[in-house]
């Protein structure tokens, strides 16, 4: 029973870490990366479709993304969707494909993105702590219902505390790497 609670908590903490990685992927670092366009939705036959569903996004060089639509007639819609996505990107339409130059980040935007990264990391920390609280609550309930002994509860609590320390260290490391990446000129 304790192992099930621990395993469930671990799975949920992994999902929080994956969510953090996804959030970090959405934050521009000054280098071209396809995940920057991950949130762009393109109107496709009356339905908003992710950009990856209507075009290939590749890195042409360290400062340029190349977007090649699967259907040539989608080029205008893709151009408009990227321009209006609030990413501060201006695609260049070359007739068959779009090129997106990454503007160098100013010190001010770097600091803004660093704040964004810290906020995402804090959200992940809060999520992990909430998972810990839920798991410890389940252990207390099992003890109260006399399904496990107090010693087993303490052992389970110690295992969950060790787990949270590991995940908080991973969050701190990921945040530090992202901040270093953002502040590199």
UniProtKB/Swiss-Prot annotation:
Keywords for the protein's UniProt record, in alphabetical order: Cytoplasm, Protein biosynthesis
This protein's record includes keyword Zinc-finger: no
GO biological process: one example: cytoplasmic translational termination
Key word Cytoplasm present: yes
Top-level division of the source organism's lineage: Bacteria
Annotated GO MF terms: ribosomal large subunit binding
Any one annotated GO CC term: cytosol
InterPro entries: Ribosome_recyc_fac, Ribosome_recyc_fac_dom, RRF_sf
Pfam families membership: RRF (PF01765)
Annotated localization: Cytoplasm
Broad class of where this protein is predominantly found: cytoplasm
Coiled-coil regions, chain positions: none
Family recorded in the similarity comment: Belongs to the RRF family.
Family matches, as HAMAP family: RRF (MF_00040)
Function, in words: Responsible for the release of ribosomes from messenger RNA at the termination of protein biosynthesis. May increase the efficiency of translation by recycling ribosomes from one round of translation to another.
Protein name in the entry: Ribosome-recycling factor
